[in-house]
Amino acid sequence: MHARRSFLAVATFAVSATALAAQNAPQAPPVTVGGVVYTQYQYTDAAVHTNTFDVTRAYVNVLGRFSNGITTRLTTDIIPSAATNQVIRLKYAFAAWTPTGSSLTYKLGMIHTPWVDFEETLWDYRMQGTIAVDRNPIGGPSTMTAADIGVGVDGHWNGERINGQFVIVNGEGYSGGTGDFRKDVEARVSVRVQPTNDNSRVGGLRVSGYAGIGKVTGTGADRNRYLGMLSYKTVQYTLAGEFVSVKNGAVTGSIISAFGVYHLSSPSKIAVIARVDVFDPNTSVANDGNTRIIAGASYQLSPNVRLLADLDRLKGQGGATAINQALFQAQFVF
C-alpha cells in the first residue's frame, strides 16, 4: 500500500510539472522584426568607366500577428541617394484581416500591388535588380510599382491552384504621393493548369494575367497596363515569359520579358540564371527601345546569405553603344 501511494504521488507530481511547464512555455511573440539587405560591387564600361560598392536596398520588416486573424506589416525601404548618404522611405504599412476559415485576406493601408511581388517571388532574384515592369519607365519612374495606398483583397483556392488579388489604390505608387480624386483599379489572377513538385503560389505550369486601369493625376489621361504570363516552376528550375502592353494617354508601349533559373541539382546551393527584357516605350516610333540581357550564377552560402556573380548588358536601338556591367552581389536575410 505504501509503494502504491508513493507511485501515485510521483505520477501526480509529474503530471503537475508537465502542466506547469506547458503553461510557462514561451509563446510566439505577437510582433517580430527582420530585414533584407542587398549589397554589391559594380563595374560599368560606360563612356566614363565606374566601379562602386553599393548597398542598393535595406528593408526592415516589423510584422504583427494577433488574435481574430488580424496581422500588420510595417516595412521601411532604405535606398542610396546622390545628395545624401541614404534615404529612408515607407514601403508597406497596412493592417490585414483573414476571417476564420476564409480564403480571403482584406488589407488596408500601403499595400502590395497585385503583380510585382508575385513575379519577384517567381523570379526569386530581386537581389540582381528590379523586374522588367519595375525597371523600365513608361509613364513614370517605373511601369508598375510594388506598393500603393488603398484597399485590397487577396485570395487563394484549392491549395493555391488559383490565386489572385484585387486593389483600389491612388495609382501613384508608394513614393509618388497621394494623387488626386482619381483612383486606379488593379487585379491579378493566376491558375495552375498542371502541378509539379512545387505547390507554392507560383509553382507548377501557370497562366497568369494582370490588368491595371487608371487615370493620370492632373490630366486624366489613360494609365492602363495589361500583362499576360506563362510560367513553369519546379523545385529545380523556373521558366517564364510575359508580354506587357502599356498605355499612357495617346502613347502605347510594350515590354517583353523572359527568364529562367536552374539549380544544378535538387536541392543545390548553386544555380544559374538568365533573363532578357525587350523594352519599347512607344510602339509607333522606330528604334526608341532597348534590350537588356542578364546572365549569372549564384551560391547559397547559408539559409541567410546568397551570393550572385552576373553580367548585365543594356543595348539601345538605333546604333546606340551597349553598356555592360559586371556585378558581384549579396543578399542577407535576418
Language-model-derived ranges and their functions:
Residues A187-V189, A322-F334:
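Outer-membrane beta-barrel "beta-signal"
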Residues N24-Y174, G179-E186, S190-N199, R206, ...:
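Outer membrane beta-barrel
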